[in-house]
């Protein structure tokens, strides 16, 4: 993906 948002153990 182009985004680098990580939450807990999930990166989107």
UniProtKB/Swiss-Prot annotation:
InterPro entries: Urotensin_II. Disulfide bonds join 6-11. Pfam families: Urotensin_II. GO terms for molecular function: hormone activity. It is found in: Secreted. Keywords: Disulfide bond, Hormone, Secreted. GO terms for cellular component: extracellular region. Has a suggested role in osmoregulation and as a corticotropin-releasing factor. Probably involved in smooth muscle stimulation. Belongs to the urotensin-2 family. This is Urotensin-2. The lineage of its organism: Eukaryota, Metazoa, Chordata, Craniata, Vertebrata.
